[in-house]
Amino acid sequence: MARVKRAVNAQKKRRTVLEQASGYRGQRSRLYRKAKEQMLHSMTYSYRDRRARKGDFRQLWITRINAAARANGLTYNRFVQGLKLSGVEVDRKILADLAVNDAVAFTALVEVARAALAAAPEPTAA
């Protein structure tokens, strides 16, 4: 059986890892072992943070909606409750965009929510 020489494969693997780590500081961009270790951590962080990004954006949207709703005299939870009662199905991303870029449309939605809240019966405390 012929002997398998793996020098080409090993060099390619090392070159790939060092290219991926090219922007890192110090030994992490120059030494294979340090670069490989850093790449393992980096990939773990990027995997985790791609999932965390969804929640971060939702939190940002809610903060923006709350600020705009309070400027119009409603809190976030009352505003969302009023929209739900009135049957308006606009997601938080669009609401946040309206709050930042189209204050007139957002104010109209606040009025719709306020009207729905006024028409709805108040829950009685048991």
UniProtKB/Swiss-Prot annotation:
GO CC annotation terms, alphabetical: ribonucleoprotein complex; ribosome
InterPro entries: Ribosomal_bL20 (IPR005813), RIBOSOMAL_L20_CS (IPR049946), Ribosomal_protein_bL20_C (IPR035566)
Superkingdom, natural source: Bacteria
Signal sequence, renumbered to the chain: none
GO MF assignments: rRNA binding; structural constituent of ribosome
Listed PROSITE patterns: RIBOSOMAL_L20
Gene Ontology process terms (BP): ribosomal large subunit assembly; translation
Keywords: Ribonucleoprotein, Ribosomal protein, RNA-binding, rRNA-binding
Cited function: Binds directly to 23S ribosomal RNA and is necessary for the in vitro assembly process of the 50S ribosomal subunit. It is not involved in the protein synthesizing functions of that subunit.
Family: Belongs to the bacterial ribosomal protein bL20 family.
HAMAP family cross-referenced by the UniProt entry: Ribosomal_bL20
Protein's name according to its UniProt entry: Large ribosomal subunit protein bL20
Species: Frankia casuarinae (strain DSM 45818 / CECT 9043 / HFP020203 / CcI3)
Source organism phylogeny: Bacteria, Bacillati, Actinomycetota, Actinomycetes, Frankiales
